[in-house]
Amino acid sequence: MKRREFLKSAVTCAAFAATAAAPCAEPKTSGRFFRGRVLVNNRPIAGVIVTDGLVCVRTDAKGTFAIPERKGARFVSITVPSGYQCADFYYPASSATKSYVFRLSPWKTSAGKGCSFVHLADSEIGGMYATEWMENVKCVADEDDAAFIVHTGDICSYRGMRAHLLAMNSHTMGRPVIYCLGNHDMVAGPAGETCFEQLFGPAWRSFEAGGIHFVVTPMPLGDHKPSYTMDEVADWVRNDLAMIPKGMPVVFFGHMMTNWNDCSMETSGFTIGRKHFNFSKVCNFTGFVYGHTHQNYFRRSGKTAFICSSPPRMGGIGHAPATLRTVRADAKGRLDSTIRYGTSAKLKIARAGAKWETQLPGKVLFCTPIVKDGIVYVGTSDDEGCGNAGVTALDAASGKIVWSKPMENSVNNKMVFVKGLLIAQDIEGRVRAFRPSDGAVAWKYDPRIHPWQILLNGLAADPASGLVFAGNGHRMVAIDASSGKVVWKDDGARVRGEPCADTAGVGEGCIVSSRNWDGMFCNDARTGKLLWSVIDQTRRFPGATPLIADGRIHALAATSYLEIDLKSGKTIREKKVPGGVQVTTRVLPTEKHFIFGTVKSGLVALDRKTLDVAWKGAVGEALAPFAAYSKLPQRCVGTIPFLMPDGTVCASSNDGAVHFWRESDGKHLKEFRTGAPYFADAVFDDGCVFAADAAGYVRAFKV
């Protein structure tokens, strides 16, 4: 049958799947049917799954199939088996079509036991002008021998979807490209999903690769209402899973979990629409790969992995670096992954004159090293599922590892040292207090947080009272550092917005915190009582850690420096800052300046009296964007600057260097260029600057 030519040449292919089970029995041929054949080199192939979006059958020994016509059928499509690909894996369902012919071609990359694929999510582009990053995707796919590329939705708008279709398809990428329907992909038309389906085909489908069955599900709701219901999708999923051999690994793709609570640790089942699926009865469920939250996240529950990736071209809403993730599935469907931040290029790592350097197994994101009594403590991230999350203690003089203890998930942000204990929090809210001598756990705190609301913020502490503050913006908890007992909990009434990677400001009896798309909150540090909250267009986009001093809050949000009255939350002064300030920095007050990092203007100093820009501290081009929604090129300092004993300003930077500037005029004095981006603050102790980078290197620079 005829189809629009540009769709025929540019449509994404499905690549795929499984060792075919025995073909189904010959379907009844009375009445009206969707009929057709599946061929390989003009020869019939048996056992291929064919569906109309509800009913599923397999081709017979002659490669033929027949599905009873039904009202509401949109497409006739196939589940492309392992070892094959198909340029036209679907056709619009029509009673006028006499025969649907699907032609498979061999695809060795998906023919083995297990496979690799590149996962993308939330690229949110506006047109062809924003496709330059896709070359990096192809490079990663080629290097990792990916069987396919999957984009789990929020391609964004008609122009964005069309640009993806033209620039990222099976021809340009050299392998099948799979697209999922996200909430921002539902655009104006007869139904929210109409445009997506005209460009990419069925919003729900399956395919196979490496002996694994992959199931694609759509977003339940979006910017425009879809015509389908998730109950319809659930009925098809049940029929689809009934076609595969028992024990065959199954991995789901979707823009988000099919049900809000699906990524809990309970693996007895999940829900699509109003219909429950019991893992042990319906399939060998080994993974759900999704997007939507703009975060890097890997959680394993038994044999099942839940994987979320940050956008590939910009920082996530919670300051996750732009990410290209390769997922590897073994023959049993077990998923592991490798992350590259923002680019396919290999970083050129250099020691840069460091007194010592030690590489840790995991990456270091926003976890600032803590130096105490001759020991450097660093927390590591594991968004790849490799088991590298933990806390490591190193000898400050030599860099030798003193002890290393695992955490259940990533230690993405700041730790604290209070009451003789090192205290860390992972992104699922678990808090652990380690004894500095040997890393033994003194106490634990394990909250039950909502599975979508992972914690990206750093821990804060009040050394005077011995309280440690965990949580972010809502459901904050104050814990006694000595005993681990909870002193107070926020009531959790404000469950809005998204997490951000700041650290709460503590001082003068108050604790000030923020949430993206929500606002700023001030609690009584002793009781947890909410003193005030402010939600406005500026404070809805935080990122930086607030500084409390002399009854004022010095805050940075969106594009502004804010001076706020601590008692009332009212803004006293505001200054628009060139380059944007939605980064994980904090204001450094000096005698004449307020100094802080920016997204695009390096380090900026404001005159304390006038708030005029006094100087800008230059840095190189950033290596990986992480500030929310920010894209390259940029000159980003996303860390907290500090004053050296000689009065110079020091900060680590996204350009892969630790920089030093003259405080009076911002003149660049020197740098240690090591090659990997710095998201964590550098610190000074006993004549050395200590810094930890995104490649997991910890270094000591003698200054």
What are these regions (language model features)?
Residues 5-25:
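N-terminal export signals
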Residues 363-391, 408-431, 451-476, 490, ...:
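Repeat-blade elements of multi-bladed beta-propeller folds
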Residues 54-68:
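Short, acidic Ser/Thr/Gly-rich low-complexity loop/linker segments typical of extracellular
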Residues 80-96, 161-249, 271-285, 295-334:
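Extended active-site neighborhood of metal-dependent phosphoesterases/phosphodiesterases
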Residues 346-365, 390, 400-406, 440-451, ...:
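Aromatic (tryptophan-biased) beta-strands that constitute blades/sheets of beta-rich domains
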Residues 395-398, 436-438, 481-483, 524-527, ...:
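Short loop/turn segments that connect beta-strands within beta-propeller blades
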Residues 29-41, 93-95, 118-121, 239-243, ...:
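Metal-dependent phosphoesterase/phosphodiesterase active-site architecture
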Residues 29-35, 40-41, 52-54, 70-163:
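N-terminal active-site segment of His-dependent metallophosphoesterases
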